[in-house]
Amino acid sequence: MGSDPSSGTVLGEQVDLDEKFDIPGTEENRVAGPETPFVVIPRGGCRQVGRSCYHVQTREGDYLVDCGIAQGQSAVDYPDFQGIDERSIDAVFLTHAHIDHTGALPIVEHQDLLAEAAPVIATRPTGALAHVLLHDSLKIHQDEACEMGQDQEFTRDDVHDVLGRMETLQYAAGEVGDFVSVDDEALRFKFGNAGHLLGSAWLALETGGRRIVFSGDLGGRSAHLPDIEGPPSADTLVLESTYGDRPQHTGFN
């Protein structure tokens, strides 16, 4: 994602978030309201490849869109979860299974940031691939922690527990009639094929008469994947820009 990590979006208007991460996630500090049904806070993935994670606040709920890691040469970079209250995240939406979009899921479980009944919502292929990739990531993490003489950031139990939250859907399962409900708020959501990986999807969220679309990672032009499905119109679009500075690119995977 090619956006400024010190800014976020409130229905298309850029807002300064330099101090946002220092604000505890209490009800008194919630920014979303009648005039701004969505507030989006980048927790990772801005001006970098990896650790994609967006914190979406609505009037009654808090959600994460993706929850990945960035694998460096000497260390793993996790999203910045500072200011998120324990058990305050009501659901996590995954655009696809690559570890830069899913690898920090055991961290939010370990830090007890997910509400008791919070689901992890994904397409069926993404759910299946995430089971494989997160267990593989755990083994790598255990080996690296042992080699460096450090404590583990998460455990096998965390992987097991967060995967136990997985709720998988077909691409069109989030159309009108299916929605995530938190308290008195109906958050409608829809997945559409993003053509990047088996099960990859863009995500549309809708509440309060407004809609925001997250592209996830797009494309690959693979003969083994269907074409990208056009998303609905949106008030705000969060768009991948990994190769946005190149006039041509033959493949994106």
Label every model-predicted segment.
Residues L198, W202, R211, R221-N253:
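Cap/insert and terminal regions of metallo-dependent hydrolase folds
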Residues C46-R51, H55-A118, A122-L129, L133-G164, ...:
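Pre-active-site segment of Zn-dependent metallo-hydrolases
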Residues I89, L163-M166, A234, S241:
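Short, well-ordered alpha-helix to beta-strand connector turns
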Residues D4, G12, D16-R87, T168-D227:
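Core dinuclear metal-dependent hydrolase active-site scaffold
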